[in-house]
From Swiss-Prot:
Belongs to the DENND11 family. This is DENN domain-containing protein 11. It comes from Homo sapiens (Human). The modification N-acetylvaline is found at residue 2. PANTHER family: DENN DOMAIN-CONTAINING PROTEIN 11 (PTHR31017:SF2), LATE SECRETORY PATHWAY PROTEIN AVL9-RELATED (PTHR31017). Residues 1-61 are annotated as: Disordered. Residues 30-40 have a biased composition (Gly residues).
Amino acid sequence: MVEQGDAAPLLRWAEGPAVSLPQAPQPQAGGWGRGGGGGARPAAEPPRRREPEEPAAPEVLLQPGRLELGDVEEDQVVAVFVVTFDPRSGNMVEWCLPQDIDLEGVEFKSMASGSHKIQSDFIYFRKGPFFGLACFANMPVESELERGARMKSVGILSPSYTLLYRYMHFLENQVRHQLEMPGHYSHLAAFYEDKKGVLHAGPGRGSSLPPVYWLPSIHRYMYPEMKITHPAGCMSQFIKFFGEQILILWKFALLRKRILIFSPPPVGVVCYRVYCCCCLANVSLPGIGGTIPESKPFFYVNVADIESLEVEVSYVACTTEKIFEEKRELYDVYVDNQNVKTHHDHLQPLLKINSADREKYRRLNEQRQMLLYSQEVEEDYNPCEEDLFVLFFLEQNNRIFQTLLEVSASQDKTLTAEHARGMGLDPQGDRSFLLDLLEAYGIDVMLVIDNPCCP
C-alpha cells in the first residue's frame, strides 16, 4: 500500500531576487474594474527594498533535440488581474491590466471549485497560449452582503510557466491586501508597468505567438527550473505520494496519453504533480517525437475547459471537479488520489507493476539515498534531487529510443527479448507497452516477443 503523502506541508518556494515595485506614481490606478470603486491608497505593507539582481542562469523551453542556448526565456507578464467571488453573481474578474486582454474563463481557472472550504491556495493554469499563476485567499468578514466570507484571487499571465514562481510571494501579499483593502490596485498597476510584455498586434494576437515548448533538453537546461526549496521538493513528494506507481505514470506520459489528476482542494500541490508527470517523458535524442503530439501541461482545468479538452490528443492536467470522471471521452488515464486507472481495454496491461518496474524504482531510491548522503555528509548540493529525478528518466527514455532506432536501422529490424531487457523493460510484462510505443512513435521494427503461454 502506497503511503499517504498529503500530510506534508505545501511546498515552499525558494525566492529568487525580490520583486521590486516602483512607487505608485498616482493615487488612482488604471485598469478596468466592475467592483470596489474609490481611489487607491498606498498598500498596507511598506514598499519592498530594491535589491541588486544577480545574473540568472538561462532558462529555456525547447523541442526535443533542439538545444539553442541563445534562446533565453524573457521574463514577461502579459496580464495581471483580480478575481472575486460575488455571492449574487459568482466568480467574476474585478480588475485587470491591460484592459483589452481576453480573460474569459480566468475567473474560474484562478479560483478552483471547492476553494470556499480552504483559507488559501495557489493555482497554475493555462489560458490559450499563456500560462497563469494565481494566489487565492479566503477571509471571514462580518458582512451579511458577503455572507460572512470574502474570497479573492490575484494572478498573472505569462508566455511560459517556468518563471511564474518568481512572483508567488508578491501575489500572496497582494491577495491579502485586496481582501483587507478592496479596490486598491496601485501596486498591481505599477507591477504590470514594470513587467509587462509586448503582445503581437492584430485580432489573433494570442494565436500568433510561437508555440510553447515545455520539453527540456540536457542537464541544467533539461527541465523547467521551479526552484523549490530543499528538502520539500516536488519530486520527492511526488515519489513519496505515488511510490512504484510513478512507473505506471511514466509509461502513460511517454505514450502521450491524456492524463487527468483529480484531487479536492488545495490544488497547488496537485499542480506540482502535473509538472512532475511531464518530467517523466523527456527525450533528448534527435529524431524522436516528430510524429507524436506535443504533451501539454494544462495544470488546473474545470468544466469551462471541456470544449478545449475535447480536441486535445495529449495533455496532463488536474481538477477538483468530480464530474470529469464521468466524461471518459476527455481522458485516457484518470488518477484519483493514488488510484491510477484507465477505461481503455488495450491500456489495462500497463496498470500492472512488473519486475523491471520494481527494479527501476529500487535504483531510483538508491540514487536518491546516495544523493541525500552526499548532501548531509559532504554538504554537496549540486546536483539537487530534482536534477537526479529528471536525469534518471531522461537516461531511461534515451536508452529505450536509442535501442529502438538502432534496431530499426538494422537489416532484419527484429526486436527481441534481449533487447527489451537491455532497455530496462520486462520482455513479457512490457510487451503491450512496447507495441504501443512503436505505434505511437512510428518506429519500424518487428517485435518477436511472444505472449506468455496460458497454463
